[in-house]
């Protein structure tokens, strides 16, 4: 079977080693994985179907695609051509907009922070919560465009200089700041959980200088995670939780294009080996 691994060029440069690891794990399991740059890919839609072009040349359809970029239109176009995508369009669409994600969590009664959608096009006259609270881009990831709002001046300044239209505001009452738990999930399986902490920032992201260690999930925590997993059709994702002052998990977000740096730094788990196994098993089922 032949699959495409799709990256933007600039991201592929940064993730060169990760891409080579991806391809090696695929080869071990007799899958051919080809790196395709998003900028060189064209999907031409016509009355009777679509064709794929790389650098202007028509190419054969792959059996599956692994999309390592934000967005959903690419997934939707591939799926219209009956090409299996990882993650699929539904997962990508919901997980890449926090309002959509929270609506799904609300459906299945997963504990979350009080959350308000904020449009910078028509911002509210007054802040939605008492200070301090969190304001973050509804489409951001990796800890970017996340702000600690502790006074009126900061509230007004962020809204005035916002680089995206959609934000969410969240009450951080009774939440442990500078600490969160990332749960790595492949398909229907919980692979591992990692506790991230940061003594110098309210954000716990590893890339922002946080520390990490493996985290043992209590049975009640696993039950919460299983509830989320059963609601979706995941390929590979990272589900992030904050910690309530009482120690319980509070849902934060789902990372669609999740990496494995933090898991590699804290364990010997080969995440990509497991992901390729999942993809191969999924494709064998699809082709029956």
Where are these regions (language model features)?
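Active-site nucleotide/adenylate-binding loops and adjacent lid/helix of ATP-dependent enzymes
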Residues: 2-9, 14, 19-20, 24, ...
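Conserved N-proximal alpha/beta basic substrate-recognition cap immediately N-terminal to
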Residues: 10-114
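Short glycine-enriched loops at secondary-structure junctions
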Residues: 70-72, 91, 196, 242-247
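Protein kinase-like catalytic core scaffold
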Residues: 133, 191-192, 237, 250-253
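Phosphate-binding site of ATP-dependent enzymes
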Residues: 147-232
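A short beta-strand motif that forms the metal-chelation/ATP-contact edge
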Residues: 183-185, 247-260
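A long amphipathic alpha-helix within ATP-dependent nucleotide-binding catalytic cores
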Residues: 202-251, 262, 273-288
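Short, flexible active-site recognition loops that position polar ligands and cofactors
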Residues: 260-270
């Amino acid at each position: 079977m032949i699959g495409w691994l799709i990256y933007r060029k600039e991201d592929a440069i940064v993730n060169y080693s990760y891409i080579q690891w991806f391809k090696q794990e695929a080869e071990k399991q007799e899958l051919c994985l080809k790196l395709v740059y998003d900028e060189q890919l064209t999907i031409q839609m016509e009355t009777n179907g679509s064709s794929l072009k790389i650098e202007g040349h028509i190419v054969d359809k792959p059996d599956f695609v692994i999309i390592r970029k934000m967005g959903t239109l690419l997934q939707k176009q591939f799926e219209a051509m009956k090409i299996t995508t990882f993650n699929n369009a539904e997962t990508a669409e919901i997980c890449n907009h926090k309002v959509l994600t929270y609506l799904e969590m609300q459906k299945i009664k997963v504990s979350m922070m009080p959350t308000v959608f904020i449009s910078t096009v028509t911002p509210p006259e007054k802040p939605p919560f008492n200070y301090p609270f969190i304001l973050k881009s509804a489409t951001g990831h990796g800890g970017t465009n996340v702000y600690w709002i502790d006074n009126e001046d900061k509230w007004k300044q962020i809204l005035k200089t916002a680089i995206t239209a959609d934000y969410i505001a969240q009450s951080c009452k009774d939440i442990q700041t500078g600490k969160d738990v990332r749960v790595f999930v492949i398909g229907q399986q919980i692979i591992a959980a990692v506790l991230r902490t940061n003594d110098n920032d309210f954000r716990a992201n590893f890339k922002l200088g946080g520390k990490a260690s493996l985290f043992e999930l209590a049975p009640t925590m696993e039950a919460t995670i299983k509830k989320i997993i059963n609601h979706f059709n995941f390929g590979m994702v990272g589900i992030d939780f904050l910690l309530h002052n009482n120690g319980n998990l509070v849902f934060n977000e789902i990372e669609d294009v999740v990496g494995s740096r933090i898991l590699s730094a804290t364990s010997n788990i080969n995440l990509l080996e497991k992901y390729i196994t999942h993809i191969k098993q999924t494709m064998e089922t699809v082709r029956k």
